[in-house]
């Protein structure tokens, strides 16, 4: 009965929210929440719900993805973006019991410093801009199912202007008790703005609905994952550039090329692969169809949309690096360090004794 009530509540919630978020990119507030939150996600294509549950930083993508035997409980990710912007995330986990988990996360995206001018062209000095979020995450596991939620206080500032919002993620996952197989569904960034930059500011929240699965075949050192994102609106998500030139037909008329149904569907898909050489070393590969379609040059697509990375664990310290090729002029790099503070504290205690 409780499951039926929850399903009914979610259906009403989604029915109400879908029309509000049926917009293309550029019209959303706090859109930095779409960025990958840790090195693993970045290396697997930027969107993933079902990667290794032992990775603490996965809770930003899927709050229901937990594991009772986390190798680390503290994780720091540092991203280098283009034009001097930097992005950092910090995560911490506390196991309340074998079935209940509490996570805390901080995200900060700094855009750097800018020169300000008034309408007359006179300098007003420099100013900075940034986005940030504080996340409290809770998950409850009733094997083989897990439910999780993220409550996020989000903020954004540009010079003397600021905006705040309250957002919620809801997710559920099925984790096979014996095989390396996971299925997950996540509804992200449902919420509202507490305040806007000005009274005239009108933005929608960065809503997203995602579903994904991952599977590692037995006796095969590879884990495959597929994630579908931006499932709503169901309509065309393609941005039709009005400046894009069409094809000239036999009569000399310009005909705009339309995007096929297959292309519209494939842009919602992200695929990833992990090469699992051992528990202490793996390589990650990913492909993002939407990124390749939207950000690559029409005459030279190169490797846009691809991503890769690796993880190396030495005792209680885990180091990871990933790179995502965003466009021809560059990409995003992520350096991550994860620690098991309990083990480190235990070692220090033994030394003192």
List the predicted regions and their residue ranges:
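Sec-dependent N-terminal signal peptides
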Residues: 5-16
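N-terminal secretory signal peptides that target proteins for export/translocation
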Residues: 1-3
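Subset of outer-membrane beta-barrel
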Residues: 23-353
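Sec/Tat signal peptide C-region and signal peptidase I cleavage site
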Residues: 17-22
């Amino acid at each position: 009965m409780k499951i039926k009530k929850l399903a009914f509540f979610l259906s009403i919630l989604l029915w109400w929210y879908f029309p509000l978020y049926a917009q293309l990119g550029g019209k959303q507030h706090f859109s930095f929440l779409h960025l990958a939150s840790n090195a693993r996600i970045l290396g697997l294509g930027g969107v993933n719900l079902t990667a290794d549950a032992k990775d603490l930083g996965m809770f930003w993508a899927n709050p229901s993805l937990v594991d009772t035997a986390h190798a680390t409980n503290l994780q720091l990710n540092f991203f280098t973006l283009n034009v001097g912007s930097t992005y950092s995330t910090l995560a911490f986990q506390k196991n309340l019991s074998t079935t209940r988990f509490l996570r805390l996360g901080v995200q900060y995206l700094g855009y750097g410093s800018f020169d300000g001018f008034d309408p007359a062209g006179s300098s007003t000095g420099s100013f900075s801009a940034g986005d940030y979020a504080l996340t409290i995450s809770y998950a409850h596991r009733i094997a083989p199912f897990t439910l999780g939620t993220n409550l996020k206080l989000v903020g954004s500032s540009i010079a003397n202007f600021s905006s705040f919002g309250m957002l919620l993620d809801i997710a559920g996952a099925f984790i096979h008790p014996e095989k390396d197989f996971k299925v997950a569904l996540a509804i992200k960034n449902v919420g509202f703005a507490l305040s806007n930059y000005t009274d005239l500011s009108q933005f929608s929240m960065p809503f997203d609905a995602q579903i994904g699965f991952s599977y590692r075949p037995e006796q095969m050192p590879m884990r495959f994952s597929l994630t579908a994102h931006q499932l709503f609106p169901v309509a065309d998500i393609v941005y039709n550039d009005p400046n894009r030139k069409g094809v000239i037909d036999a009569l000399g008329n310009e005909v705009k090329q339309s995007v096929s149904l297959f292309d519209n569907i494939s842009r919602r898909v992200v695929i990833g692969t992990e090469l699992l050489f051992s528990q202490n070393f793996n390589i990650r590969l990913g492909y993002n169809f939407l990124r390749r379609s939207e950000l690559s040059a029409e005459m030279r697509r190169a490797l846009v949309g691809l991503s890769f990375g690796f993880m190396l664990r030495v005792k209680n310290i885990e180091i990871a690096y990933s790179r995502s090729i965003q466009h021809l002029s560059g990409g995003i790099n992520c350096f991550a360090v994860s620690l098991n503070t309990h083990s480190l504290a235990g070692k220090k205690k033994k030394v003192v004794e």
